């Protein structure tokens, strides 16, 4: 039976990309349907308020860009705060600034000038004897030396990938962000911040006037959903979209443990702390 097209666009997934497409297309007069298999909008940037705190339910997401048009676009929707990502790593009770910069090198070796830091890194490179790195571990040591690798890279990387660093390919860490200035800003982009009121508020604004169906799995009735829209914009797992005929992609996930603590003021003194196996 012929089913009349009801929508110009079916958008599968209500994360940042799907929502942005829905917003822009709706602005141009197209009729869109957004579906999401989760019980909420926003995808992995979903936030909810807990005791006045905007909690990022799927891990922290800091918006950053050097494109002025993009920055003006998101700020036309909601106001962004001036959050600057400056994480610290806690290794055996000692704190190190990230990304690797002169503060890190001072904390690690006591050096105070870029020249001293470069000499220390070069010394450890030579001592490693690694000329042609065959895996991630060798690549990292050849780039930054053994001290920083074993203190700040190895454990967290192995947890992140679920494999030994010696089993991971070298290209994963071809470039390491290394700065020879006292700059703890994690990103090089010109603009960064987090939406005031959380990402969910921004997503809600973009979806205003757009039909949204939650708890709706595209693959639960794919033939039907494909039939009701002229075009489909899919933002989910790409291997599943092609029925795995090109193989299966390996996905890593994150386990979240939430603990509500009663405290006054700052608990850690920074928003983002890394431990050998955890982030807080």
Q: Model features per residue range: what roles?
A:
Residues 1-4:
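Short, Lys/Arg-enriched N-terminal segments with co-localized hydrophobic residues
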């Amino acid at each position: 039976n012929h089913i009349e097209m009801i929508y110009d666009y079916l958008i599968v997934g209500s994360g940042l990309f799907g929502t942005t497409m829905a917003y822009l297309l709706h602005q141009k007069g197209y009729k869109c349907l957004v579906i999401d298999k989760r019980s909420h909008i926003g995808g992995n940037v979903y936030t909810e308020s807990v005791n006045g705190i905007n909690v990022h339910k799927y891990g922290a997401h800091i918006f950053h860009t050097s494109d002025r048009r993009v920055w003006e676009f998101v700020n036309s929707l909601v106001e962004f705060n001036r959050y600057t990502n400056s994480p610290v790593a806690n290794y055996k009770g000692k704190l190190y600034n990230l990304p690797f910069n002169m503060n890190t090198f001072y904390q690690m070796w006591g050096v105070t000038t870029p020249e001293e830091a470069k000499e220390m890194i070069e010394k450890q490179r030579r001592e490693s004897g690694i000329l042609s790195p065959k895996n991630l571990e060798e690549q990292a040591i050849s780039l930054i030396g053994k001290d920083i690798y074993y203190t700040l890279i190895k454990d967290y990387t192995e947890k992140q990938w679920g494999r030994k660093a010696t089993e991971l390919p070298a290209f994963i860490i071809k470039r390491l962000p290394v700065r020879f200035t006292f700059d703890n800003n994690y990103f090089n982009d010109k603009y960064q911040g987090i939406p005031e009121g959380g990402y969910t508020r921004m997503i809600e604004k973009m979806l205003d006037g757009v039909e949204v169906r939650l708890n709706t799995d595209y693959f639960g009735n794919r033939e039907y959903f494909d039939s009701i829209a002229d075009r489909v914009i899919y933002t989910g797992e790409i291997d599943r979209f092609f029925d795995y005929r090109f193989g299966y992609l390996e996905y890593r996930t994150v386990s979240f443990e939430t603990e509500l603590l009663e405290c006054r003021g700052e608990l850690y003194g920074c928003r983002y702390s890394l431990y050998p196996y955890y982030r807080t």
